């Protein structure tokens, strides 16, 4: 960048022309590798090798824009395909810029998370054949008048404090290092001039920006002209500032990615406008009325406006007033945005997400800079007096150069065309999409149950430059018409009336020879590969068809396609009996399909197989376990009549002990948290608990019988002694009393002894577990001490399937009829699938995948899978 800095220090405007990334290819030799001035008019459709700054060769492919043909029709046919200026000199050779100069292409370190402008800024070495000052006073640098620049106080010392450079002694680099280390709060990281880093300007911008809530649009409040933030008004300077600005976002994203990864399943999406034309918007757009600017600036109405924005479209964060359709996804950056939590956790929540608010501010400043550049080019093409620019042909501005791997490049820049409003700088948009909730098959991806809908259809909001209106993209039109309008990577038939701006010329891109090269020139400003699964997103209540897998090999390759076509639900045409019963409809969203792997389909199929295989058995098994105490009913006989003793104390005490046992069960279930672990322990402890309960019941019965006998004998003896002492002479009455008392004692003792001598075989059979007499004989004859071991006699507690229950899979029962078999099998099968897919990462246990988040009191609402059809999350 040394040569670039030398040119900026010079005040001559014609030297500033070299700083703009114009791509004006001259005539070439027939077989020359480097660009030269020799004649070769047929440039389009051929590979041009341009020498890099590091003497590395890279291939560039050039396509001619459609606007060039229309405007350059007056020129000669030989030179119609050349990039040259119009109406300047009659000699055509002098009108050509020579590309002996080197071009700088920066490589990205991190393909997924690095945000970098595709730097095509020309570093001039040979300064020959520059046009005369009379014809090009300011060239394309778009300087303002001297009156406007003199009013700014600090602009006089521009050439002494050029902070756009990458020198180590520069103030902007020091500021950048402090930001990377997170030493202090960085509200204004993109202010490259030293004097702009003062406290006054930071306070001024801080007042206009709403730092608490990212939903407040910063476009209208931060109306300060961007020329105040820059040291000069040149396009080349401002574009270099964008380079530095985006590098700051790289550091913040990478720092946040290291800290906040693998916590939630939230994703940040960057929405970039695809520049829809006004004629195409009326077909399927429903206009959205913005909130007024005065209401946004009013402090009393801010809360109402935020609620309105949340209710209208909860997926979009209004970083700015433009909302575009999705063209790229930034993966695995978590916790961006606001989650609905309880009021008690608000303080921790604000501290947690504070670092992301600064990124929203930074992106808004970048968008304001892009607005300034686009407005200048559009205004200066009309108002010539403002910038003192002569008529500029569209041939003077470059074609659109972008990276080949568009999924890895988040911010791709290109120069705006002066005669075409739709081609402008792309804006970075951050949109938070919450997918942490479990997936529901009935709804399309990204759509919530309680989300408000416009005309009963989900809508994307986009921006049109020509009309400056916020519009909604209607989903019903997407169903009826071609769904490939959503993205430009789909091949569209132009005969059906589709918009040609969405189409990418795949025929011309096949000529690129070097696949490892990251630079390629396209006819369009669109992406080569964007999010692949947008058609799947709109398939509602339908399984995936095999045709979608064949589209451009976006989800699966040709080799892997035959393997995974078995995973698709073909309905009655399927040959396998197992696959007819197991209807596999898959969860597919932006994150899964963008990896271009079939492992996600493997994972989804295996987990759904497990859940469908044992769901019916587990539901019945758990239902009987929860409701098994309902079999014994409370029967209280009314025996409190006069002259009779109440001998139902045993039943009342038994009922009281039941309530105590229920409280103990609730405490134990709260300890373990998960119902499955509690059920496992409960089933394994059945035998040991039964032995203990028998011993406890014997002790309780002995105590109760002793107390009853003592009371009765005391009363009888007391009566006997009274009668004997008072009526010694009445022998007849004495004999009668003996007979009566003898009968009473016999009845009482018979009842008590009958309850003592009850055999456990005579207990009522429970719905959950049935007893076998053969196994019980083995238990009583067993001499080994296995009373404390809980899992040894698990073969006793057999679960015999009912004859009526035909729906139960008999695979559920092992040869030993062990109840623990299904849960252990699910765990092992789940772990095997996880380890095959994720070799390095840790697996989520099954207790986290399948569980009840809410504990419900009423028994009617207790369902095994919480009323949701799909129970898996991405590990």
UniProtKB/Swiss-Prot annotation:
<feature type="compositionally biased region" description="Low complexity">
    <location>
        <begin position="31"/>
        <end position="44"/>
    </location>
</feature>
<protein>
    <recommendedName>
        <fullName>Uncharacterized protein PF3D7_1409500</fullName>
    </recommendedName>
</protein>
<feature type="region of interest" description="Disordered">
    <location>
        <begin position="29"/>
        <end position="48"/>
    </location>
</feature>
<feature type="region of interest" description="Disordered">
    <location>
        <begin position="481"/>
        <end position="510"/>
    </location>
</feature>
<feature type="region of interest" description="Disordered">
    <location>
        <begin position="680"/>
        <end position="705"/>
    </location>
</feature>
<keyword id="KW-0477">Merozoite</keyword>
<feature type="compositionally biased region" description="Basic and acidic residues">
    <location>
        <begin position="695"/>
        <end position="705"/>
    </location>
</feature>
């Amino acid at each position: 960048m040394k040569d670039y800095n030398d040119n900026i220090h010079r005040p001559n405007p014609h030297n500033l022309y070299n700083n703009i990334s114009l791509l004006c290819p001259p005539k070439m030799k027939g077989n020359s590798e480097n660009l030269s001035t020799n004649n070769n008019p047929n440039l389009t459709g051929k590979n041009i090798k341009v020498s890099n700054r590091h003497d590395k060769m890279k291939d560039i492919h050039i396509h001619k824009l459609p606007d060039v043909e229309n405007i350059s029709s007056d020129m000669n046919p030989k030179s119609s395909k050349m990039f040259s200026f119009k109406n300047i000199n009659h000699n055509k050779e002098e009108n050509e810029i020579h590309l002996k100069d080197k071009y700088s292409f920066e490589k990205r370190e991190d393909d997924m998370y690095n945000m970098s402008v595709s730097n095509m800024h020309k570093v001039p070495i040979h300064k020959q054949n520059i046009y005369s000052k009379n014809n090009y006073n300011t060239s394309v640098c778009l300087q303002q008048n001297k009156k406007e620049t003199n009013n700014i106080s600090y602009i006089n010392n521009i050439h002494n404090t050029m902070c756009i450079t990458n020198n180590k002694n520069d103030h902007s680099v020091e500021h950048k290092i402090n930001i990377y280390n997170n030493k202090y709060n960085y509200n204004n990281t993109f202010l490259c001039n030293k004097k702009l880093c003062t406290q006054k300007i930071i306070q001024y911008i801080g007042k206009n920006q709403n730092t608490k809530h990212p939903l407040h649009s910063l476009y209208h409040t931060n109306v300060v002209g961007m020329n105040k933030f820059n040291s000069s008004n040149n396009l080349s300077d401002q574009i270099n500032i964008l380079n530095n600005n985006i590098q700051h976002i790289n550091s913040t994203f990478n720092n946040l990615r290291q800290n906040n990864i693998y916590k939630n399943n939230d994703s940040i999406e960057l929405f970039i406008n695809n520049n829809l034309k006004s004629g195409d918007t009326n077909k399927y757009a429903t206009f959205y009325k913005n909130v007024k600017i005065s209401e946004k600036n009013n402090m009393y109405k801010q809360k109402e406006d935020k609620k309105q924005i949340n209710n209208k479209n909860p997926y979009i964060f209004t970083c700015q007033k433009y909302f575009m359709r999705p063209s790229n996804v930034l993966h695995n950056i978590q916790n961006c945005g606001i989650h609905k939590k309880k009021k008690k956790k608000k303080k921790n929540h604000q501290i947690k997400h504070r670092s992301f608010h600064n990124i929203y501010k930074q992106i808004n400043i970048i968008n304001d800079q892009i607005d300034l550049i686009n407005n200048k080019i559009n205004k200066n093409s009309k108002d010539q007096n403002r910038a003192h620019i002569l008529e500029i042909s569209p041939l003077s501005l470059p074609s659109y150069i972008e990276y080949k791997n568009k999924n890895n490049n988040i911010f791709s820049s290109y120069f705006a065309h002066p005669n075409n409003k739709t081609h402008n700088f792309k804006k970075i948009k951050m949109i938070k999409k919450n997918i942490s909730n479990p997936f529901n098959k009935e709804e399309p991806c990204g759509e919530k149950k309680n989300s408000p809908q416009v005309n009963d259809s989900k809508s994307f909001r986009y921006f049109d430059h020509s009309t400056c209106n916020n519009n909604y993209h209607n989903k019903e039109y997407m169903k009826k018409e071609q769904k490939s309008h959503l993205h430009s990577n789909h091949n569209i038939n132009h005969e059906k009336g589709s918009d040609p701006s969405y189409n990418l010329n795949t025929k011309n891109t096949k000529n690129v020879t070097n696949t490892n090269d990251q630079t390629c020139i396209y006819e369009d400003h669109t992406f080569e590969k964007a999010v692949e699964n947008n058609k799947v997103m709109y398939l509602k209540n339908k399984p995936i068809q095999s045709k979608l897998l064949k589209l451009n090999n976006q989800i699966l390759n040709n080799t892997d396609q035959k393997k995974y076509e078995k995973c698709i639900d073909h309905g009655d045409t399927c040959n396998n009996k197992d696959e007819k019963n197991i209807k596999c409809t898959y969860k597919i969203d932006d994150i899964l399909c963008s990896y271009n792997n079939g492992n996600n389909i493997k994972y989804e199929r295996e987990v759904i197989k497990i859940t469908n295989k044992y769901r019916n058995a587990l539901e019945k098994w758990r239902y009987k376990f929860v409701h098994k105490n309902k079999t014994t009913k409370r029967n209280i006989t009314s025996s409190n009549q006069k002259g009779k003793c109440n001998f139902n104390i045993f039943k009342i005490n038994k009922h009281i002990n039941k309530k105590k046992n229920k409280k103990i069960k609730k405490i134990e279930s709260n300890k373990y948290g998960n119902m499955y672990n509690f059920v496992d322990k409960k089933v394994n402890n059945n035998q040991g608990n039964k032995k203990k309960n028998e011993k406890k019941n014997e002790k309780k019965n002995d105590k109760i019988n002793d107390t009853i006998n003592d009371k009765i004998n005391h009363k009888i003896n007391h009566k006997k002694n009274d009668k004997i002492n008072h009526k010694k002479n009445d022998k007849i009455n004495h004999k009668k009393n003996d007979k009566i008392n003898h009968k009473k004692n016999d009845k009482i003792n018979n009842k008590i002894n009958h309850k003592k001598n009850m055999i456990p075989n005579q207990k009522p059979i429970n719905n959950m577990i049935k007893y076998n007499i053969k196994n019980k004989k083995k238990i009583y004859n067993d001499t080994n001490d296995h009373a404390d071991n809980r899992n040894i006699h698990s073969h006793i507690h057999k679960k015999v399937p009912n004859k009526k229950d035909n729906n139960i899979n008999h695979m559920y029962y092992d040869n030993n009829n062990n109840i623990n078999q299904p849960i252990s099998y699910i765990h092992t099968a789940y772990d095997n699938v996880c380890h095959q897919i994720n070799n390095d990462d840790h697996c989520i246990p099954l207790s986290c995948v399948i569980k009840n988040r809410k504990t419900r009191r009423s028994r009617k609402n207790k369902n095994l899978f919480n009323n949701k059809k799909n129970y898996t999350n991405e590990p």
